[in-house]
């Protein structure tokens, strides 16, 4: 079997789901982010409730404190829609963050959910 055939065989059942990564650079003035953090969190929660936010959160170097950098993964139909959502983030709208948008093709990985029937709660494992 050739290398190309092996690659095809290995990837034929993979997910191939297109998502968009919003990679936000560290803020030159992270202390200014605090004033806009409630609005940012409300915005992210609203995106989550709409079903377009896959995951989001701060980035830090080697366990150090967050410096204003962040990563947000969006489920949108296009890069243009993802860019529109990124531009509407209060941190970006107020000039506190710059970002880079990348298309991300999810091929492999896993997500675990645990449903507790006794209290009808769900946990992400």
Residue positions per predicted region:
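Conserved, structured core segments of small domains
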Residues: 1-125
